[in-house]
């Protein structure tokens, strides 16, 4: 049977300054300079080196493999001074067979390169390309006869369910390196065996399958594949399986298991304050908990392949996922092979996840208008590749705001979504309504989604009269209030994804008074502060009873009468000022009260069993800390 040992400790890291220090994995060298602005974070080659003793294994009957789950963006791996593999693409798993190269004591060196180049994606985008070994490295010992480890970094097991007339047929294809007999069993959530089959191309059948049914009932089976040699089990792979159907209709939106299922959710970048992309499982768990609290049922995992652990969480909690490769912003004529290899790895490594319904081939690729013919051909090749490798899912892409509805790139994939910031980068929130209606009028048979929309919001910036571009928490909330009403009038949209769930690093930016950051998140970069907009979405999407008073951080006010805005998913909200009830409203999501402001007041909102409190005070002059002080900057703010 296979054994796995992590190689996470005692790495010698030689960084940009040429000095060598001791680090633990996960690690990135851009955790600080990739988040502080200036578009000057260091990109180049750094070296990681460690020693390990050869694992106990029988060379006649076993093999040893190294597994790398994320090295950004190019890796050159050396074992005992010998170059054993290279890998281009910083977000996917790769493995290398090392049995014949091991000594008693071994030196493993990984040269990691995130340099600017013309053939590996991403090269231009509104996020930081952190260099480093930021996911796990493992040493694996397996039988010489084993379930394949050398196929695009996948598990060697491909599971394809088909549902019809209330029954399920499940095809389980197993790649074997060596020889042996394959047996397959399907276990229900309680661990009971509900189906069995034999062979490397096995068929399982269920008469009454329990469906994976989104966030309300994300039921998962477990498929156990065993490889036996001479009657002895020598290898085993377990995979969670969700059984579901889905479809998309341009007039009625997304369907899950045959019924309408409105997809409303968020996009997610994986990085964190102070650690970059070198995040832990506990951080993944916290991200998922916040997304679930919001009430989202879909996640766009942008703009690259995320950690397998997070896809597992999406399976577990019923999130419908858009998965994509980092073919982004600027087409590279020399980069086609890299888009193909990254897509093959994305599909192979994630094929078995029931959460995933579509493969994203690119994002805002028309920002650069050069090499248009080659770019379109690259898209067609990717689209065809996705369909060839996976006939069970759809393809999509995210179009740049300035990519008009008639652009041919928007009509290659099965689905299309737009990144539109009307009301933020462009004046006029009302234009969102017009844009959706126009596209639907011209292309009534084309499913349309919003892959990005949002506005910057700083929890420390405030205004009683918020305006586009002021970066206040209030304008961000005002923007999202409009967008939610807009989507409610366009229920035929196949999916909408807020940009972004969390603030994230973009070292080229200098906006909102904090260089190096994109502040469109509903939650701050450190995950410690839920902005008011977070609670707005919770009011629309969540079933968890709550009430929230907005603008709590906007304490000092100059007006003699102020608005107290309240978000809640309850039908009635009562407001108290200094203990006296001043009003009660019935409605949905957003409740607004006008109250006089003299001196300091204590405000309490009550909705059912839920309460929230806030304090405000009248001041004679505006608090200068609430207003953005704009400075001249050479940083390239993304538009």
Task: Name each model feature, range by range.
Residues 171-173, 288-291, 298-540, 544-560, ...:
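Substrate-binding/catalytic cleft of secreted carbohydrate-active enzymes
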Residues 1-305, 311-313, 317-321, 342-348, ...:
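Secreted/periplasmic carbohydrate-active enzymes, especially glycoside hydrolases
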């Amino acid at each position: 049977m296979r054994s796995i040992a992590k190689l996470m400790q005692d790495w010698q890291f030689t960084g940009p300054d040429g000095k060598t220090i001791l680090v633990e994995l996960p690690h990135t060298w851009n955790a600080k300079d990739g988040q502080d602005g200036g578009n000057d974070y260091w990109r180049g080659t750094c070296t990681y080196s460690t020693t390990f003793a050869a694992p106990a294994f029988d060379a006649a009957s076993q093999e040893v493999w190294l597994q790398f789950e994320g090295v950004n963006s190019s890796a050159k791996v050396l074992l005992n001074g010998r170059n054993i593999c290279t890998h281009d693409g910083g977000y996917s798993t790769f493995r290398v067979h090392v049995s014949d190269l091991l000594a008693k004591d071994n030196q493993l060196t990984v040269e990691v390169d995130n340099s600017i180049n013309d053939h590996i994606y991403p090269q231009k985008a509104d996020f930081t390309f952190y260099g480093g070994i930021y996911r796990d490295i493992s040493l694996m010992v397996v039988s010489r006869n084993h379930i394949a480890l050398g196929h695009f970094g996948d598990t060697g097991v491909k599971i394809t369910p088909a549902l019809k007339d209330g029954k399920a047929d499940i095809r389980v294809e197993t790649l074997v390196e060596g020889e042996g007999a394959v047996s397959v069993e399907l276990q229900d959530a309680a661990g009971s065996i509900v189906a069995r089959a034999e062979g490397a191309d096995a068929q399982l059948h269920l008469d009454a399958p329990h469906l994976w049914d989104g966030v309300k009932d994300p039921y998962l089976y477990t498929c156990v594949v065993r490889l036996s040699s001479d009657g002895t089990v020598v290898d085993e792979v377990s995979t969670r399986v969700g059984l579901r159907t889905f479809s998309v209709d341009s007039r009625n939106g997304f369907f899950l298991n045959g019924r309408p299922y409105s997809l409303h959710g968020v996009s997610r970048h994986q990085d964190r304050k102070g650690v970059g992309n070198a995040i832990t499982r506990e951080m993944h768990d916290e991200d998922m908990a916040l997304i679930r609290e919001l009430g989202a049922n879909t996640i766009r995992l942008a703009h690259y392949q995320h950690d397998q652990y997070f896809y597992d969480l999406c399976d577990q909690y019923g999130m419908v996922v858009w998965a994509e490769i980092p073919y982004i912003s600027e087409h590279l004529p020399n980069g086609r092979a890299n888009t193909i290899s990254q897509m093959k790895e994305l599909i192979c490594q994630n094929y078995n996840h029931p959460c995933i319904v579509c493969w994203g081939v690119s994002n805002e690729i028309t920002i650069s208008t050069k090499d248009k013919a080659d770019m379109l051909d690259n898209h067609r090749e990717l689209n065809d590749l996705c369909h060839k490798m996976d006939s069970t899912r759809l393809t999509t892409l995210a179009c740049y705001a300035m990519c008009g509805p008639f652009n041919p790139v928007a009509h290659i994939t099965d689905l299309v979504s737009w990144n539109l910031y009307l009301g933020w980068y462009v004046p006029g929130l009302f234009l969102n309504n017009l844009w959706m209606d126009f596209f639907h009028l011209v292309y009534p048979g084309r499913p349309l989604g919003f892959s990005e929309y949002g506005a910057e919001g700083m929890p420390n910036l405030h205004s009683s009269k918020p305006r586009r571009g002021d970066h206040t928490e209030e304008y961000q909330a005002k923007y999202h209030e409009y967008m939610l009403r807009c989507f409610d009038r366009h229920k035929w949209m196949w999916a909408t994804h807020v940009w972004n769930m969390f603030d994230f690093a973009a070292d080229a930016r200098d906006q909102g008074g904090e260089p190096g950051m994109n502040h469109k998140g509903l939650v701050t970069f450190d995950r410690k502060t839920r902005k008011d907009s977070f609670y707005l979405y919770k009011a629309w999407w969540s079933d968890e009873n709550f009430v929230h008073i907005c603008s709590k951080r906007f304490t000092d006010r100059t007006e003699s009468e102020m608005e107290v805005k309240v978000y809640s998913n309850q039908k009635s909200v009562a407001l108290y000022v200094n203990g006296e009830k001043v009003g009660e409203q019935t409605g949905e999501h957003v409740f607004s009260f006008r109250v006089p402001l003299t001196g300091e007041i204590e405000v309490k909102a009550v909705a059912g069993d839920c309460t929230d409190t806030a304090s405000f005070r009248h001041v004679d002059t505006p608090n200068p800390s609430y207003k953005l002080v704009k400075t001249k900057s050479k940083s390239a703010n993304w538009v």
